[in-house]
């Protein structure tokens, strides 16, 4: 018996159990097995009758997971896992472990990306497919079932999160008290500036963290680096972000990848400061400066800015009393750092 195609497997589970006339507490038994006892295999959910376990296996497969691990790579503080998803495609997810014991996860929303940012490995692949809500949340569930603590989550892996509307189903799963039960404030969604879905984040998930990938304060240059700027111009995005702050009271993070000789000058820093100070809530913008991480598929003409330029840029922003940090580097040696995820695909010719 095949069930209707609800947005997530948890909805499909409810429908399936109802169709079998199972008591309503069966769903809770399954979710407790997964999220309380970390059991991912249906045949090991021994609180369920054997016949029901067999029915679940026949309908959903042996595991609750919809992703399949292919390769795991580890460095000192980082684990990167390559996962197979529907259509025989692949995505990557990253776990970062901090010395204080905190664990943070970076997950993908798309297989590849169709927006073509010129300095990004994922963008060099092109868009293979949008991930389902289950494929997004199962990247986390994979780590959780292995015993890891989901202290914070960011949609900063492969893909543009807000270009995949299924992310909103995924976010609902992550905050569902019967499922992952994550605090919205532990979740960060990154975007290049998809205005309609930023507005949807404002109304539907006001307490979640929002990061805007800016990378140049100049319209023409940003359009060259990030073609999406032609559809959603920087001026308009900044207005929408200001409205987001007004309605939520939450700060917005500005991600800025430092590209040597491209966007790392004092002129760029001063223009970035001017853009932020022109908004109603300049103290609620937090700039994250990110060292560029070249890898497979990224053009050779981009390089990492020199440390002196990075520090000068930092001082210009900080002197304007705008919160600013230089993001710590994790996982560069295993292609797990910012902008390096490419799912072992070959880059398209640009």
Curated annotation (Swiss-Prot):
Keyword terms of this UniProt record: 4Fe-4S, Antibiotic resistance, Cytoplasm, Disulfide bond, Iron, Iron-sulfur, Metal-binding, Methyltransferase, rRNA processing, S-adenosyl-L-methionine, Transferase
InterPro entries according to UniProt: Aldolase_TIM, Methyltransferase_A, RlmN_N, rRNA_lsu_MeTfrase_Cfr, rRNA_lsu_MTrfase_RlmN/Cfr, rSAM
Top-rank taxon, per record: Bacteria
GO molecular function, one term: rRNA (adenine) methyltransferase activity
Record bears the keyword Disulfide bond: yes
Active site, UniProt feature: 92, 338
Required cofactor(s): [4Fe-4S] cluster
Family assignment from sequence similarity: Belongs to the radical SAM superfamily. RlmN family. Cfr subfamily.
Miscellaneous comment in the UniProt entry for this protein: Reaction proceeds by a ping-pong mechanism involving intermediate methylation of a conserved cysteine residue.
Protein name per UniProt: Ribosomal RNA large subunit methyltransferase Cfr
Source organism per UniProt: Shouchella clausii (strain KSM-K16) (Alkalihalobacillus clausii)
Lineage: Bacteria, Bacillati, Bacillota, Bacilli, Bacillales
């Amino acid at each position: 018996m095949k069930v209707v195609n609800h947005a997530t497997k948890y909805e499909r589970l409810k429908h399936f159990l109802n169709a079998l006339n199972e008591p309503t507490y069966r769903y809770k038994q399954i979710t407790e097995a997964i999220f309380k006892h970390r059991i991912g295999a249906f045949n090991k959910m021994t609180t369920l009758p054997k016949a029901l376990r067999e029915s679940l296996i026949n309908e959903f497969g042996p595991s609750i997971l919809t992703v399949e691990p292919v390769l795991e790579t580890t460095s000192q503080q980082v684990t990167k896992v390559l996962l197979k998803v529907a259509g025989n495609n692949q995505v990557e997810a990253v776990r970062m472990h901090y010395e204080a014991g905190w664990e943070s996860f970076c997950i993908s929303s798309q297989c590849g990306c169709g927006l073509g940012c010129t300095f990004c490995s994922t963008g060099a692949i092109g868009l293979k497919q949008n991930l389902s809500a289950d494929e997004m949340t199962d990247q986390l569930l994979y780590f959780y079932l292995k015993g890891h603590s989901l202290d914070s989550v960011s949609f900063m892996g492969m893909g543009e999160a807000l270009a995949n509307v299924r992310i909103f189903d995924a976010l609902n799963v992550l905050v569902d008290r019967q499922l992952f039960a994550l605090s919205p404030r532990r979740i960060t969604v990154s975007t290049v500036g998809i205005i309609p879905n930023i507005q949807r984040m404002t109304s539907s998930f006001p307490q979640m963290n929002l990061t805007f990938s800016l990378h140049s304060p100049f319209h023409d240059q940003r359009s060259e680096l990030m073609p999406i700027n032609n559809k959603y111009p920087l001026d308009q995005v900044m207005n929408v972000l200001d409205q987001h702050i007004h309605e939520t009271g939450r700060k917005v993070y500005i991600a800025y990848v430092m590209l040597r000789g491209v966007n790392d000058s004092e002129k760029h820093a001063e223009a970035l400061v001017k853009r932020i100070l022109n908004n109603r809530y300049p103290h609620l913008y937090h700039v994250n400066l990110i060292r560029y991480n070249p890898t497979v598929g990224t053009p050779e003409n981009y390089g990492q800015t020199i440390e002196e330029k990075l520090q000068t840029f930092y001082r210009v922003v900080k002197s304007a009393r705008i919160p600013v940090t230089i993001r710590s580097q994790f996982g560069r040696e295993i292609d797990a750092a910012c902008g390096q995820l490419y799912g072992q695909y070959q880059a398209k010719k640009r």
